[in-house]
Amino acid sequence: MKIAILSRNSKLYSTRRLIEAGRKRGHTVRILDPLRCYMRIAADGFSLHYKGKPITGFDAVIPRIGASVTRYATAVLRQLEFMGTYTPNPSDAILRSRDKLRAHQLLAAQGIDMPVTVFGDNPDDTQDLLSMLGPPPHVVKLNEGAQGAGVILTEKASASRGVVEALRGLYANFIVQEFIGEAEGADLRCFVVGDKVVAAMRRQAAEGDFRSNLHLGGTAAVTEATEQEQEVAVRSARALGLTVAGVDLIRSKRGPLVLEVNSTPGLEGVEGVCGVDVAAAIVQHLEQSVRRSAG
């Protein structure tokens, strides 16, 4: 196969591992910086160009799209989709995952449990809005934040109101969620490829923080996801239209709750902690999917 990887940096761990895995299995792999791609759209057809030359002949494209370039990079990916290139994570699915409110609405529509989430705009409704969550602590999240950025824990009702009012003053879109205390700052990252969880790790927040992201000082250890947790993770990815995803769950008294579905999950943490060749699993999934679509 001829595989394209949409990535701004070929030296990033995840990008390097996907290149290695693809070439090891005999495929031609090329890195495309999405911001260097440009396109022609007309009724007589679609074309994509890169550094002065047309891009043609790719069987599959793996999107590694950072949050800061979401809009442009998904437009490039969509162009490749219209040109008949297979992708495990379509452009519309990535856009769903990057909008926390929309993602939670789609998950809830499939009966997938999550922390209770509220969203509202008018300041006159703030008190009633927050009352739907019960007493604090509350978790306020920017709607398009990533990697733990823009996530605030408020421990008093006055703090919740203050943060909500401040974000409205900045015209920021945000959601507010109930805080699940029994999770004790830990979550479960399930790495979904196709219709199964290929690796899982338990992440623990650093002392004094409640966010378990590894780059914020959290720690991780390999763990075994239960059958229920694996089912929830796969259903969550499917609900957004993704076949490669990092699904973050917390273990609660009412079962696994979905925090987020990441459409561009990093490989370094999960491969290093779990000792699983996730990159190879992704490439094998591409092979199977392209064969099915061709047949």
From Swiss-Prot:
Q: Does the keyword Protein biosynthesis apply?
A: yes
The entry's Mg(2+) 2-binding residues are E260, N262
What GO cellular component entries does it have?
Answer: cytoplasm
Residues involved in Mn(2+) 2 binding: E260, N262
The record's GO molecular-function terms, alphabetically, read:
ATP binding; metal ion binding; ribosomal S6-glutamic acid ligase activity
Relay the cofactor remark from the entry: Binds 2 magnesium or manganese ions per subunit.
Q: Which residues bind Mg(2+) 1?
A: D248, E260
Renumbered to this chain, the signal peptide range is none
| Record: residues binding ATP | K141, E178, F179, D187, R211, S212, N213
What Enzyme Commission number(s) appear in the record? 6.3.2.-
From the UniProt record, give one GO term of the biological process aspect. SOS response
Which residues are in the ATP-grasp domain?
104-287
Binding locations of Mn(2+) 1: D248, E260
> Which superkingdom does the taxonomy of this entry point to?
Bacteria
Keywords from UniProt, A to Z, are: ATP-binding, Ligase, Magnesium, Manganese, Metal-binding, Nucleotide-binding, Protein biosynthesis
Q: SUPFAM superfamilies, per this entry? A: Glutathione synthetase ATP-binding domain-like
Q: Does the keyword Nucleus apply?
A: no
| Cofactor(s) this protein requires | Mg(2+); Mn(2+)
Q: Which family does it belong to?
A: Belongs to the RimK family.
In terms of HAMAP family, this protein maps to: RimK (MF_01552)
The protein depicted here goes by the name Probable alpha-L-glutamate ligase
Tell me what organism the protein belongs to: Xanthomonas euvesicatoria pv. vesicatoria (strain 85-10) (Xanthomonas campestris pv. vesicatoria)
